[in-house]
A protein has these predicted regions:
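Periplasmic/extracellular electron-transfer cofactor-ligation site
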Residues: 55-69, 132
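Flexible coil segments in periplasmic/lumen-exposed cytochrome c-class electron-transfer proteins
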Residues: 161-176
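Thioredoxin-like thiol-disulfide oxidoreductase module
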Residues: 71-74, 78-145, 149-158, 165
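Bacterial Sec-dependent signal peptides at the C-terminal "C-region" and cleavage site
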Residues: 15-26
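Short active-site neighborhood of thiol/selenol oxidoreductases, capturing the structured segment around
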Residues: 43-61, 83
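Sec-dependent N-terminal signal peptides
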Residues: 4-14
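A short beta-strand-turn-helix
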Residues: 29-48, 77
Length: 176
């Protein structure tokens, strides 16, 4: 009796551990650095999405694990944007559009972060620089996927500059 039970449990364990498990598509965003984006923008214009974060920011980590890990988000960003992760506290020298930005000890961040957020530092901040190169548009705080979708599609589908965001927001239907 005991051998039969042991054999049964062994067979069940073998079946359980050898069963094919579905492979979950892993979302992947090709995060670029600013130098690469600068050179590629000369060849092909697209909006630039910059994820402004810090190493200590808890909500930045939530944005990575919930929003940026979503397959729809990753696919859309890959097709419609040049995506950059930017640590606001980097001490590296940043060159963007002919200007050099340095670490600012007074603000404890890089001046580039101050520029693209218009001095409104909050983390995370999603910054979109439209494809026409106009002023950076900063959206502070964590964005769940449904809110993120509306914002990136506003820029990615070319509605920015054509229709006020409030009007776009009223007619937008989420699909992610």
């Amino acid at each position: 009796m005991q051998k039969g039970t042991l054999l049964f449990l062994s067979v069940c364990a073998l079946i359980f551990f050898s069963a094919d498990k579905p492979i979950r598509d892993k979302a992947h965003i090709n995060w670029m650095n600013l130098d690469d984006v600068t050179s590629i923008l000369k060849k092909e214009k697209k909006p630039v999405l910059i994820d402004v974060y810090t190493d200590w920011c808890g909500w930045c980590k939530v944005m990575d694990s919930k929003t940026y890990s979503n397959k729809n988000v990753a696919d859309y960003l890959q097709n419609k944007f040049y995506s950059v992760k930017f640590n606001a506290e980097t001490k590296d020298e940043i060159n963007w559009e002919g200007k050099t930005y340095h670490y600012n000890a007074g603000y404890k961040c890089n001046e580039f972060a101050l520029y693209i957020t218009q001095g409104q530092l909050a983390f995370p901040t999603t910054v979109i620089i439209p494809g026409d190169g106009s002023q950076p548009q900063a959206i502070a705080g964590y964005l769940p996927t449904k809110d993120f979708e509306m914002i990136v599609k506003y820029f990615g589908e070319g509605e920015y500059g054509k229709i006020p965001f409030e009007d776009y927001q009223k007619k937008f239907k989420t699909s992610w």
